[in-house]
């Protein structure tokens, strides 16, 4: 995905208070299978009782960090958080001295895919043969997500839904490593889709039947796509809501305001793809501008922006920020892709990324400044939060291949800080806010006694220096501590292959 000529990009490239707090909960953490052979090799800590001592706690609520705490984990849950001076860990099965380290909630990724985009026969002249395809990354993506600290993820659109459901089953059973998963069904896309691997809806009845079929098979959310009609979207929303399931959307044919009034629960990509002001926008048809014009002409102080944000907040519509997928086209001065991310890619994936990056750099200057649009979207996301809106976060690992699972989630948090949020606010958006949207805020998303022990241990202090969020060493999921580096090393050079 890119800022300039977003529609063309999709059609051609993407086709796409911390004193002593005792445990108040008697119920155990959600049952998970004991780690099997394929999982045990990545387990660094597995004990009935673990105490993280002298650690800095960033609790995910947006509150200031608390230094020198002891966090106790038992039975997959956090059982206490105490000032280290007031606590004794002598009877712990495992004690970790974490001076100089921070612990925060596991990331709740809300726009995380399990596929990768390929352009067949892409060559140095930047030409390729149609169609753009989305091969499944069932092996590499879950390890990358978990290794980077993503302990819960929403797939936010599936191209191999049975594979995603079976992957979730095997992760939950302890057979494979990976995060907790909210499996989104196949894309709810209209007849004009440029993706061969998406269903092409022909009627509202099609939409209803698709939702009901996949809800029966275990899907827990749905995503509408760019060419869906209002009638089809309404049918899908109604069918999902009858099952207690939510619908999000990366829209174009339907405007944000229309979708909110139809009852949608979430809108993807911040404010990049709202088309309500686009010239020549026809009902149920994606505009040529695909939202660029609207973003350019909707500063936060405008009547249109204030009215839209008011509508979204009144209808309890969340917004998913996906800044990394737009960053590559946001002008010069952007940091290069991290070496760890490049190392995760196959040689072919790296080559394709470099070709596509060069094509972007050598393309004629767009009429609308991409850097301005990137900044404008950040301003609108801040205005949405200031108005009481629920902002959640994810990376969208698609585009030209430079948004990598897990690493992209970390980068999203860094970019939220660039957007003007404080580090602890950005961490809340990427943790507790996502849990709140999913209705799981009592189980995950923040560090509190009684909650699941889904935690990230990292060297440094991301509450002051957000880039320290990259220094992940241990990821706890349901109280089991995974070795981040081992997970990442296990898929080095494999992302883009499987």
Regions found by a protein language model. Give the residues of each.
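Bacterial N-terminal signal peptides
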Residues: 11-23
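Histidine-rich, glycine-flanked metal-binding segment
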Residues: 34-48, 57, 62-104
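Acidic, glycine-enriched loop/beta-strand segments at the rims
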Residues: 39-44, 57-70, 83-84, 404, ...
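Histidine-centered divalent metal-coordination motifs
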Residues: 54, 101, 111-115, 250, ...
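Metal-associated gating/positioning segment near the N- to mid-region
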Residues: 102-173, 194, 205, 257-263
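Acidic/histidine-rich helix-loop elements
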Residues: 114-134, 188-204, 276-281, 286-297, ...
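Divalent metal-dependent hydrolysis catalytic cores, especially in the metallo-beta-lactamase
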Residues: 138-162, 179-186, 216-228, 246-248, ...
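Active-site neighborhoods of metal-dependent hydrolases
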Residues: 210-224, 228, 273-419, 494-498
């Amino acid at each position: 995905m890119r800022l300039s000529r977003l529609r063309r990009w999709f059609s051609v490239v993407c086709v796409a208070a911390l004193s002593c707090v005792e445990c108040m909960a008697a119920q155990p953490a959600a049952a998970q299978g004991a780690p099997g052979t394929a999982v045990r090799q990545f387990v660094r800590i597995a004990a009935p009782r673990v105490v993280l001592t002298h650690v800095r706690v960033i609790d995910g609520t947006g509150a200031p960090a608390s230094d020198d705490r002891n966090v106790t984990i038992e039975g997959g849950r956090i059982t206490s958080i105490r000032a280290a001076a007031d606590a004794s860990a002598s009877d712990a099965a495992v004690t970790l001295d974490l001076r100089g380290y921070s612990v925060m909630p596991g990331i709740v990724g809300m726009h995380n895919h399990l596929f990768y985009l390929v352009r067949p026969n892409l060559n140095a002249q930047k030409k390729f043969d149609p169609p753009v395809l989305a091969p499944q990354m069932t092996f590499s993506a879950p390890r990358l997500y978990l290794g980077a600290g993503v302990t819960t993820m929403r797939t936010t659109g599936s191209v191999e839904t049975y594979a995603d459901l079976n992957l979730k089953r095997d992760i939950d059973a302890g057979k494979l490593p990976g995060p907790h998963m909210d499996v989104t069904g196949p894309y709810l896309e209209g007849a004009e889709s440029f993706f061969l691997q998406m269903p092409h809806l022909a009627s509202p009845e099609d939409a209803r039947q698709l939702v009901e079929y996949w809800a029966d098979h275990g899907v827990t959310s749905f995503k509408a796509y760019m060419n869906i009609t209002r009638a089809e979207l309404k049918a899908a929303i109604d069918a999902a809501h009858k099952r207690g399931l939510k619908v999000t959307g990366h829209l174009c044919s339907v405007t944000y305001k229309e979708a909110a009034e139809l009852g949608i629960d979430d809108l993807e990509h911040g404010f990049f793809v709202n088309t309500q002001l686009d010239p020549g926008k026809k009902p149920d048809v994606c505009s040529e501008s695909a939202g660029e014009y609207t973003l350019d002409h909707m500063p936060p102080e405008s009547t249109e922006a204030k009215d839209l944000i008011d509508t979204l907040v009144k209808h309890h519509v969340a917004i998913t920020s996906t800044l990394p997928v737009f960053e590559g086209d946001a002008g010069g001065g952007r940091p290069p892709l991290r070496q760890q991310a490049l190392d995760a890619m196959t040689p072919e994936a790296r080559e394709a990324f470099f070709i596509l990056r060069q094509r972007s750099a050598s393309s004629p200057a767009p009429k609308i400044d991409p850097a301005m649009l990137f900044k404008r979207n950040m301003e609108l996301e801040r205005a949405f939060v200031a108005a009481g809106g629920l902002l959640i976060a994810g990376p969208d690992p698609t585009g030209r291949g430079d948004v990598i699972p897990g690493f992209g989630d970390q980068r999203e948090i860094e970019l939220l800080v660039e957007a003007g949020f404080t580090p602890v606010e950005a961490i809340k958006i990427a943790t507790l806010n996502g849990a709140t949207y999913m209705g799981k805020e009592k189980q995950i998303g923040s560090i509190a006694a009684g909650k699941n022990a889904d935690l990230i241990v990292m060297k440094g202090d991301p509450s002051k220096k957000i880039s320290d969020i990259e220094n992940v060493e241990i990821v706890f999921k349901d109280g089991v501590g995974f070795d981040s580096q081992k997970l990442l090393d296990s898929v080095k050079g494999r992302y883009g292959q499987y």
